[in-house]
Amino acid sequence: MKQIIQLCLLKIYALVERTGLLSTSMGRSLFFAAYGWYKLFIEVGNIRSLRSYVKPGEIVIDIGANVGFFTKQFARWVNGSGFVIAVEPEESNYRQLLKNLNNSGTAGVVRTVQGVVAEQHGTLKLAINPVHPGDHKIAAEGIDVTAFTIDELVQQEKAFRVCLMKIDVQGAEERVLLGAQETLQRDHPAILIEIDDDALRQMGSSAERVVTLLMDFGYVIRKFGKNSQMDQISLAEALGMCRNGRYVDLLFV
């Protein structure tokens, strides 16, 4: 059902985009209001359940921040000396992210990074999807973007513990985790990941590789969804949820 609603909304987005309405201030405002409603009530489930993982003075990392729906939520939870690191590569999304943080009064506790997260520092290509503002992805061709590793981003922040990471990077999830091994070993943050086996396979990875990698670091898998009790599930159950072109949100703790 979630995928059907998303496809319908994307078709509407493509039609409206052709009218030029999205280039106007009112059009953009309406779109982002609708996007926020979709994220909150359709896609992300019980986001408030993640709050228990955020302690005073700790770091939350939002990888694939888009325009900041999760970032704003996380920023309201951190306190003391804690802060959020939000990473988003695409220019228009990044500008809207900054605007949304300023408008929500949360910019003071968010450190934004324009780029992608991968297994090593460097320059990669980002393929832009003209009809899906949340589907830009690392590819062989596209615009140049700077790539960072998680371990690099927190290198100067070792006095702080990374308590929570959200990863939504259109199939590059394994690459993100490979560049975060020191952080995973040291801090063992809770990790919310959107897993799409088809997208992962297009990048030479798979849902099984991502889940197994995290289990090797001592993580257990929990369901994450609307009204979910976040029950622990097995590897086989997790992989079964990813079959037939479905993508799922899983929480690793």
List each language-model region with its residue ranges.
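Phosphate/nucleotide-binding beta-alpha loop and adjacent structural elements of enzyme active sites
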Residues: 1-253
